[in-house]
Amino acid sequence: MSDRAEVRNIPFKLGMYLTVGGVVNSNATRFSINVGESTDSIAMHMDHRFSYGADQNVLVLNSLVHNVGWQQEERSKKFPFTKGDHFQTTITFDTHTFYIQLSNGETVEFPNRNKDAAFNLIYLAGDARLTFVRLE
């Protein structure tokens, strides 16, 4: 996943809503939305896998701990994404959980494993083009 768009020094805090929109490449195999403090400290990594290894049309969620590595993956079959189409994902969180609303209105939850109350880096990587980021 070499293509990347990022927003640094963004004040994403408890009670706020982060909406990320973009367009999935027509030949996509995967793309990810990441929320954290740095590229080696990611609290929420949501990897959209269209066809990657043995994974077909699945969301893989994880977190990356600095100097430790990736943690236990969680998977969801909620996958309203289509190659070549627009997507919009809205994320909010508390000290226990990330609440991720997908384009079709379905929600996926993922633990806020470090109990963080604020993040300053959002980035999209892989086979999609970022069109907007909105923080409310």
From Swiss-Prot:
| UniProt modified residues of type N-acetylserine | 2
The record, for PROSITE patterns, names: GALECTIN
Domain Galectin: from-to ranges: 4-136
Renumbered to this chain, the signal peptide range is: none
Q: Which InterPro entries match?
A: ConA-like_dom_sf, Galectin-like, Galectin_CRD
What's a Gene Ontology MF term here? galactoside binding
Recorded hits in SUPFAM superfamilies, A to Z, give: Concanavalin A-like lectins/glucanases
Which ranges of the sequence are coiled-coil?
A: none
Q: Which Pfam families match?
A: Gal-bind_lectin
Q: Name the UniProt key words of this record, in alphabetical order.
A: Acetylation, Lectin
Which residues make up the binding site for a beta-D-galactoside?
70-76
Question: What function is annotated for this protein?
Answer: This protein binds beta-galactoside. Its physiological function is not yet known.
What is the recorded name of this protein? Congerin-2
Tell me which species this is from: Conger myriaster (Conger eel)
Write the lineage as a comma-separated list: Eukaryota, Metazoa, Chordata, Craniata, Vertebrata
